[in-house]
Amino acid sequence: MRIVLAVLGLLLSIVSAQADKAVASGRPLKLYEAYATNPDCTSAGAIVLRVAQPPGHGRVSINQAGVFPSFPQSNPRSACNRRRVPGVQATYVSQRGYLGPDLVVLQALFPSGRGVNITVAIRVM
């Protein structure tokens, strides 16, 4: 019974998000960035970011990077907004000369156990 509840809890903790972006053909486009930050601005743990569905007309690179967080002023971590914190970024580059639509689905797994699926529709111009 506990295993079923744990699996159900994990499935319910995966959230979906959608975004639309435009980019010039062959130019890099930041698709997504994520961070897990303690109140002292140190990392709260590693984030696993992976490509769940690759683009049909380009490539996605995932790299560890310093990112600027955007915590609301009411959050004790808002002091971290003024500096880079450890994070991860996904960047898209289309095939050279390609013009048209593309689509990427990313999956981010946070140290807290929360998961997010991110669908990004891309218009390559």
Q: Which residues does each PLM region occupy?
A:
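Sec/Tat signal peptide C-region and signal peptidase I cleavage site
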Residues: 15-19
